[in-house]
UniProtKB/Swiss-Prot annotation:
PROSITE patterns: GLUTAREDOXIN_1, GLUTAREDOXIN_2. GO terms for biological process: cell redox homeostasis. It is found in: Cytoplasm. NCBIfam families: GRX_bact. Belongs to the glutaredoxin family. This is Glutaredoxin 1. It comes from Rickettsia bellii (strain RML369-C). GO terms for molecular function: protein-disulfide reductase activity.
């Protein structure tokens, strides 16, 4: 089953990544449900999916955030959307975190 169908917000993270923790903290503050996919190495099948979604870049940074299958970008991009007042609009209608 496609995870994007189950969770409209997907965040690809690395364990211990401070930017990943910061992005998740903002999503938690907004009280929206999201799917976190921890990607530990370039052999992980989730990385292949992510590279395909991002047109196969040579270098990936984390986190990578998708809302309704739209690539938002990373932590700074998420916070920029919030500062601009556009994040709440993107999150309208999203399931609330349990």
């Amino acid at each position: 089953m496609n995870k994007a169908i189950l969770h409209a917000i997907i965040i690809y993270t690395l364990a211990g990544c401070p930017y990943c923790m910061k992005a998740k903290a903002l999503l938690d503050k907004k009280e929206v449900a999201y799917e976190e996919i921890e990607v530990q190495n370039s052999q992980d099948p989730n990385v292949a999916v992510l590279r395909k979604k991002l047109n196969n870049p040579d270098r990936l940074t984390f986190p990578q955030i998708f809302i309704d299958n739209m690539h938002i970008g990373g932590c700074d991009d998420l916070y920029d959307l919030d500062k601009e007042g556009r994040l709440d609009k993107l999150l309208e209608g999203q399931p609330k975190k349990d």
